[in-house]
Amino acid sequence: QPWSADAAPRRADLAVLTSPADCEAAAAELGFPLIVKPAHEGSSIGMAKVDSAAELNKALEDARAYDSDVLVEAWVRGPEYTVAIVDGRALPSIRLKTPNAFYDFEAKYQSNSTEYLCPAGLDDADEQALRALALKAFEAVGCQGWGRVDVMRDEHGDWQLLEVNTVPGMTDHSLVPMAAKADGDGPRTLVLAHGFGCWVLRPVIDK
C-alpha cells in the first residue's frame, strides 16, 4: 500500500470482501462495529455501519449491488475532518459534524443538521500536522492538482487516514470552495483549468 510504504499513518484494520465467506474472517480479525462500503462508489452510497454478523452479511449484499469489491474497516471513534488539496497546497481543514451514525448520504445531501466547521477548531500545531499529513497522503498515491483527503482522529488522538477523493464537488456549497474561501480565495478566483496533464490554478479577473 502506498500510504504504508510512505510511512504515513494508515488504517491497517481493513479487509476486502468478495464473497459472503470473507465476512466471518473479517469479523474475527477486525471485531465489531465495522463500516462497510463499495470499493469504487462515492457520496457514501452503499455504506453501512454494522454491529453483528447478520448485519455484516446484509451490508455486503447491499454493497455488492454497486461494486463486486467491498471494503470493510474497523470502526473509528472520533471526529472526522477533510482537507482540500489544490496545486500542491493543503487548504484549511474542515470538521464534519453530524448527529447520524456517520457522515452518510443523508448527512451530506439531505440533512439540515450537518455542520461544517472551518476553521475546524484545532490548535495551530494540530492544524499544521493534519494539513501536512493530508498533502503527504495525497502525493503518496500519485495524485496531482486538486482533491480532498478524508481523515479521522481516533480516541487516542491519532490521525487515521480514510481515503482520497479525486473528484470532489466544486459547486458553491462544496467543501473545496469552502476551504479555499477560508484561505482567502473567493469562488470567482478559484478556477481550475486543465493543462499539462493535470489540474492547475488560473487567476480570474472579476468583471
Model-derived regions, located:
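Active-site nucleotide/adenylate-binding loops and adjacent lid/helix of ATP-dependent enzymes
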Residues: 1-79
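ATP-dependent carboxylate activation and anion-phosphoryl transfer catalytic cores
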Residues: 8, 123-199, 207
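Short, flexible turn/loop "capping" segments at secondary-structure junctions
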Residues: 38-40, 109-111, 172
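Phosphate-binding site of ATP-dependent enzymes
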Residues: 51-132, 158-160
